[in-house]
């Protein structure tokens, strides 16, 4: 399919640099979905609490999305002179086209819609920073992405419309802002919690997969995951947060033997039909930012 026009401005960024960051985005998606065992989520062992998707769907989806990540970076660079609040509207057509390719690759299964939103924002932020010759760090990338999303939660979640979306309903009932709120705030769960936690575990010499699984537990314990709340209500969300925190309090995931606790947690999530997809999206962001 044809690419949406990105901007009338040109970018000075090298294609190799753009492709390098796009490749990291693809690797981040694959790293997350291949990580096993993950409670309630699709992984190499099972399909979690999902009956409509499998591991291969995520692999096809990630490949389809990879081709669009350079477009997000290019738009971020080409729009570097625009007010940050104006950037999001320009990103939407690229995101919608990317989403269309994702659905075609998976025969209609929503595998990575949340990641298109978050990685699209982060890639655009990287493009803007590179174009302006500013440092590309986890903090600058997330703060730039936040500037694109200023006012997003108010605009899209606060409404008096009688026909509420799932996100609007969860916001009104439980105060959950989901992916929009996390992006608008500059991904504080990642920057202040998950990323330093993950990097500290790596510095301590922990196996990277175990470190990532432990970081997933941290996100599950702290994230107001709208995916979980939409399936299990407030009770399901609080149960999942409590169980994840209990595992962390008991030492977390430090050895292969600890994986038995995750397998049991996975079985319980499947029984309750709970899938922490929002936390999985934040784990993708965490791994991605850890590489830059």
UniProtKB/Swiss-Prot annotation:
Record GO biological process: prosthetic group biosynthetic process
Keyword Nucleotide-binding assigned: yes
Taxonomic path: Bacteria, Pseudomonadati, Pseudomonadota, Gammaproteobacteria, Enterobacterales
Cited PANTHER family: 2-(5''-TRIPHOSPHORIBOSYL)-3'-DEPHOSPHOCOENZYME-A SYNTHASE, TRIPHOSPHORIBOSYL-DEPHOSPHO-COA SYNTHASE
Protein name: 2-(5''-triphosphoribosyl)-3'-dephosphocoenzyme-A synthase
Cross-referenced Pfam families: CitG
Its job: Catalyzes the formation of 2-(5''-triphosphoribosyl)-3'-dephosphocoenzyme-A, the precursor of the prosthetic group of the holo-acyl carrier protein (gamma chain) of citrate lyase, from ATP and dephospho-CoA.
Superkingdom, natural source: Bacteria
Family: Belongs to the CitG/MdcB family.
Molecular function terms, GO-annotated: ATP binding; triphosphoribosyl-dephospho-CoA synthase activity
Record's keyword terms, sorted: ATP-binding, Nucleotide-binding, Transferase
EC number: 2.4.2.52
């Amino acid at each position: 399919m044809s690419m949406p026009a990105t901007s009338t401005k040109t970018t000075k960024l090298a294609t190799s640099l753009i492709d390098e960051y796009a490749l990291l985005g693809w690797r981040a998606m694959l790293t997350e979905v291949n990580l096993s065992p993950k409670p309630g989520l699709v992984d190499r062992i099972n399909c979690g609490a999902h009956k409509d998707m499998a591991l291969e769907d995520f692999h096809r989806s990630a490949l389809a999305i990879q081709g669009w990540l350079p477009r997000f970076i290019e738009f971020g660079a080409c729009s570097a002179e625009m007010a940050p609040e104006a950037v999001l509207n320009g990103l939407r057509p690229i995101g919608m086209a990317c989403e269309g390719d994702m659905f075609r690759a998976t025969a209609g299964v929503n595998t990575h819609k949340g990641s298109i939103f978050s990685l699209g924002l982060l890639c655009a932020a990287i493009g803007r920073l590179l174009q302006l010759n500013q440092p590309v760090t986890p903090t600058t990338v997330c703060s730039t992405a936040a500037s694109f999303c200023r006012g997003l939660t108010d605009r899209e979640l606060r409404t008096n419309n009688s026909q509420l979306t799932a996100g609007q309903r969860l916001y009104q009932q439980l105060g959950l802002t989901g992916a929009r709120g996390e992006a608008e705030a500059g991904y504080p769960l990642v920057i202040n919690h998950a990323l330093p936690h993950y990097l500290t575990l790596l510095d301590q010499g922990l196996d990277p997969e175990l470190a990532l699984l432990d970081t997933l537990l941290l996100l599950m314990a702290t994230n107001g995951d709208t995916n979980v709340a939409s399936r299990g209500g407030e009770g399901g969300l609080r149960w999942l947060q409590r169980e994840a925190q209990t595992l962390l309090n008991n030492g977390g995931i430090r050895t292969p033997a600890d994986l038995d606790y995750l397998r049991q947690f996975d079985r319980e999530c499947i029984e309750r039909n709970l899938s922490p997809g929002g936390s999985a999206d934040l784990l993708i962001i965490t791994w991605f930012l850890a590489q830059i």
